[in-house]
Amino acid sequence: MGNQIAEKEKPSHLQHHFVDSDQQFESSKFGMWIFLVTEILMFGGLFVAYIIYRSWHPDLFYLAAKELDTALGATNTVVLIASSLTIALAIRAVQLDKIKAAINYMAATVVLAGTFMVIKYFEYTDKFAKGILPGAGYTYDGIAHDMAANFFSIYYMMTGLHGIHVVIGMGLIIWMIVKAKKGAVHSGYYTPVENTGLFWHLVDIIWIFLFPLLYLID
């Protein structure tokens, strides 16, 4: 009888294998940080490959980077920094039970993320039209050298993988909007929104490293 009463007193968001909400929160946060570390390791390998190739052929990397549109890259940097602000405001709004404001901030984050992807689409299509493709598909006459093709292979791999993470982040944020509308997140339970925010901040930070490494080679 006592156990049944205790079960009824548990909040609906508390999973059965946790003692209380605090334990669930700490476990979820720890798990999220472990996941983020694996993401950093994955991108870290690509950064190492970039550094090695650039150290071997600095002049060619410099010339190849000139084919990238710095203005579009800078615009996307501003867009993602703004999205970091809106997702942070969304988390704070949920903590204060300002659910409508949180939904608006999350929607703004999705719009900014979509803007990032649209800009990246135009950037990619411009490269494709010139024959600047990864690997064996590289046919651009402006820089006729194998290492230029390697630079763009790294460029597409790093920015493409980052773009996939942006799309995943958009999906997660939309899911959080749905949960917020259903009342599933609030001041007493905002772990999913906070973890989504952590993922989104990582996506932003990775781009902040990618932008100078790829677009601002000197």
Regions found by a protein language model. Give the residues of each.
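...captures the hydrophobic TM-helix bundle architecture rather than a specific catalytic motif
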Residues: M1-D218
